[in-house]
Amino acid sequence: MNFTGSPMNTFTSAFLGGIIGAVLMDITETAMARFGIRSGVNVSLVGRWFLGLTRVRLAHTDIQASVSMPHEAGLGWAFHFLIGGGGVALIYPAVLLAMDVTSPVHPILGGLMFGLVTSLLPWLVLLPAFGWGWFGRSGPAGANALLASPLSHIPYGIGVGAVMTLGSGFQ
């Protein structure tokens, strides 16, 4: 397996793969909720957090108790897909190129591993900023972010790896 495409194609494919991966993540989260596995996070809360960032509010005591803001759901969806989906996916090819790795061992397996690593972002950034503690320990009743995050990030990573394989020259 070798990388045969241009870096621009690689980053474009990763970004698009991140958006597709975010869709796969949402489908997985919906399915997991039927089995009682939930992180407690929803797009309105993500939008509320993002709007708080624009006002230099990095963290909440409990984001659910924070006043809801106009357009938070729409901004939450935009943040989820453009920053959380596509933007985070750009880290994957950047790391590969920085390490002078011509291709992961297997593009889909590499994507899956990347997806698992991205579970650290909600555990160590988003959930503490929501006021729910490391790994979401103090999240809403019934939430299990420790389990929900890796289970939903696996399909995200597979989406990134698959689109990079198809669109950027990983073979």
Task: Enumerate the predicted regions with their spans.
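Juxtamembrane/disordered regions of integral membrane proteins
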Residues: M1-Q171
